[in-house]
């Protein structure tokens, strides 16, 4: 996918990221939906800038991805990050389906896990850090509400480092879906699937790996064997920032019930649920969300360095 020639009018890679790719330095992709739809301003922009700095301190180059004025951008300026933060929900949330239309219309777009993977792959970036992946929504057996992130993971060669699937989802059905499509679900130093705000859940990952080098080797073997598709690395939230299971589950259950009552569906459901859970937990879930992103950025940096060492 990285060999596809794409017009610079459609895809622009920042000089810093371009230099890293050209000189075979490690790069970590970051998404932008977390900026515009995942947190309130100014915390969203501040967090995004701090996550970039965290990655730089580890050695790799960060590449925040978004659509600005109809251009797919890999590596944003601080001004562009602040624009996405300020505009918030006025910025279109862009998954695979929406991407060509937002670009064609010359609009701004915040990329989800799926569209960030697509653009990262176009640029030749193999490692991506986020908060949590989308998945199968609760009640999907009736609504068929399944995030496009999962299909992207089945098809696109990018490793996604996350704190598991967002705990507002049906974790059991999400793991089943990933298994059906052959997506490895790796637990980093854990056999239990992390549940975003909580370190564990009642579900298991498909394999436990304990080091970034083991993960990098698995990536290289998978793709060199012609096994296309991504890998999910589920990295538990640090213990000191994890939320008590009982209180977070009560908040999630209430938020899900309210979403159903208000008819919130589709791509609006995740931002609604995360915002409502933050309100119901007095902002504690937002603090946890920010910390788990930092934690994932650090692990993604280690994996990117190890992978670059392996493939040269």
Each language-model region and where it sits:
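Anionic-ligand binding region
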Residues: 198-224
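General beta-strand structural signal in soluble alpha/beta enzymes
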Residues: 28-30, 62-67, 103, 109, ...
């Amino acid at each position: 996918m990285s060999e596809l020639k794409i017009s610079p009018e459609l895809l622009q890679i920042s000089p810093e990221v371009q230099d890293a790719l050209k000189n075979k330095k490690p790069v970590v992709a970051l998404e932008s939906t977390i900026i515009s739809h995942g947190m309130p301003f100014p915390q969203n922009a501040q967090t995004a800038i701090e996550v970039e700095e965290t990655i730089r301190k580890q050695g790799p180059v960060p590449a925040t991805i978004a659509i600005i004025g109809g251009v797919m951008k890999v590596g944003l300026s601080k001004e562009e990050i602040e624009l996405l933060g300020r505009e918030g929900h006025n910025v279109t949330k862009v998954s695979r389906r929406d991407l060509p239309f937002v670009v064609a219309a010359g609009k701004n777009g915040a990329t989800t896990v799926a569209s960030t993977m697509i653009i990262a792959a176009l640029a030749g970036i193999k490692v991506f850090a986020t908060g949590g992946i989308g998945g199968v929504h609760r009640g999907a057996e009736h609504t068929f509400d399944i995030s496009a992130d999962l299909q992207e993971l089945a098809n696109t060669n990018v490793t996604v480092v996350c704190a598991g699937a967002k705990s507002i989802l049906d974790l059991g059905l999400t793991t089943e879906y990933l298994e059906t499509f052959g997506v490895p679900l790796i637990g980093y130093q854990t056999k239990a699937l992390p549940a975003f705000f909580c370190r564990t859940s009642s579900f298991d990952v498909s394999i436990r790996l304990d080091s970034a080098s083991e993960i990098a080797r698995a990536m290289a073997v998978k793709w060199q064997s012609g096994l296309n598709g991504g890998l999910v690395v589920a990295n538990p939230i640090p213990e000191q920032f994890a939320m008590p299971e009982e209180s977070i589950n009560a908040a999630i259950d209430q938020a899900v019930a309210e979403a159903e009552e208000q008819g919130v569906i589709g791509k609006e459901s995740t931002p609604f649920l995360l915002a409502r859970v933050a309100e119901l937990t007095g902002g504690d879930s937002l603090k946890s969300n920010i910390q788990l992103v930092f934690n994932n950025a650090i692990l993604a940096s280690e994996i990117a360095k190890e992978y670059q060492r392996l493939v040269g």
